[in-house]
């Protein structure tokens, strides 16, 4: 039985959503005009937004339904990024063939093209063939030129988040996470990795749920650019490696298993695929340098998402144990720091 779209998708502006659908109906011309016949399926695994797949029957019943994606923004996300900047990035990346097309915006959400591909699973990231495709696609993504200054944002963004976390959280959590000392950790870490390094347009949230594969062509699509910005490419790869510890579709999606963090052979293979995807041979010294930089940047990833989790725990109503997630990210930071950095006190 079809479920009415306006009854299932939470929206503060149902009239705006209706206008978008009416415009699409006119543009396409081959879909039924009864919006109550649209079928809505919630997509699992999102930790910031609510995402819905909409199947829209066509007038010719022998044709497949058209599909689109409706994304309803989570509460408090304006603390993490500027939504207008994210939309501009979304549209620019789409124009350059790297993601879905924006079909419309409404207050509190947007409508996107539905990508006819399969979202990767946690185990897919360990498949050498899929991993090679992801590495190659990430290299091309990093080469996207977004208009504006090529300024890396990771450090200032974390400093801003420290202040936001302090303002939001209880004294108990502030003490538990040592928020008064985290800015010093950010400063020291920035000094340690402050060498000459390649800057690219980074996704900054390359978990498996943001990667799709067309199983007929093996084409990879990277989606969701809310945290995208210029950053060191080593940071983006480090964050991707850290995400291999997560399974957001398990019964305990907030629990991270760092025994799944890729070993040196797996990391080296990814880096080689990344560097050689442009047709050039990878030099051993470049591989070694990137290996070293990536490991140090895993610490930045732990701080980044640890702070994100603290803030999210106070502003986001999605069913996810953000605070416990943060505990694990900070625990990993303090565990790995003395092994990875040359002069920091442990």
From Swiss-Prot:
GO terms for molecular function: ATP binding; choline kinase activity. It comes from Arabidopsis thaliana. Coiled coil: none annotated. Belongs to the choline/ethanolamine kinase family. Involved in phospholipid biosynthesis. Catalyzes the first step in phosphatidylcholine biosynthesis. It is an enzyme of class 2 (transferase). Induction: By wounding, and salt and osmotic stresses. Keywords: ATP-binding, Kinase, Lipid biosynthesis, Lipid metabolism, Nucleotide-binding, Phospholipid biosynthesis, Phospholipid metabolism, Transferase. Disulfide bonds: none annotated. The keyword Magnesium does not apply. Pathway: Phospholipid metabolism; phosphatidylcholine biosynthesis; phosphocholine from choline: step 1/1. This is Probable choline kinase 3.
């Amino acid at each position: 039985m079809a479920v009415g779209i306006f009854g299932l998708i939470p929206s503060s502006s149902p009239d705006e959503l209706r206008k978008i659908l009416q415009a699409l109906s006119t543009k396409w011309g081959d879909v039924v005009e009864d919006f109550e016949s649209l079928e809505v399926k919630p997509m699992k695994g999102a930790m910031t937004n609510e995402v819905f797949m909409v199947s829209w029957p066509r007038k010719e019943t022998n044709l497949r339904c058209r599909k689109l994606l409706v994304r309803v923004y989570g509460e408090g996300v304006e603390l993490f990024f500027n939504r207008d900047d994210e939309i501009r990035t979304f549209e620019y990346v789409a124009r350059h063939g790297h993601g879905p097309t924006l079909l419309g915006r409404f207050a509190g959400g947007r409508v996107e093209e539905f990508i006819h591909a399969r979202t990767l699973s946690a185990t897919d990231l360990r498949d050498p063939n899929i991993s090679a495709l992801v590495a190659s696609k990430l290299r091309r993504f990093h080469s996207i030129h977004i208009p504006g200054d090529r300024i890396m944002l990771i450090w200032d963004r974390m400093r801003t988040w420290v202040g936001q976390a302090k303002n939001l959280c209880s004294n108990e959590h502030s003490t538990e996470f040592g928020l008064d000392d985290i800015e010093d950790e950010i400063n020291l870490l920035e000094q340690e990795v402050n060498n000459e390094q390649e800057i690219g347009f980074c996704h900054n949230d390359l978990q498996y749920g943001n990667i799709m594969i067309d199983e007929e062509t093996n084409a990879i699509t990277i989606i969701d650019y809310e945290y995208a910005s210029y950053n060191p490419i080593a940071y983006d790869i480090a964050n991707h490696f850290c995400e291999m510890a997560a399974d957001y579709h398990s019964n305990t999606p907030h629990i991270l298993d760092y025994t799944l963090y890729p070993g040196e052979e797996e990391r080296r293979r990814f880096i080689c695929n990344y560097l050689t995807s442009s047709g050039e041979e990878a030099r051993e010294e470049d591989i070694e340098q990137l290996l070293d930089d990536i490991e140090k940047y895993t610490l930045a990833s732990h701080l980044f998402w640890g702070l994100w989790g603290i803030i999210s725990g106070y502003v986001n109503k999605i069913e996810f144990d953000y605070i416990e997630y943060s505990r694990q990210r900070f625990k990993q930071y303090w565990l790995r720091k003395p092994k990875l950095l040359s002069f920091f006190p442990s």
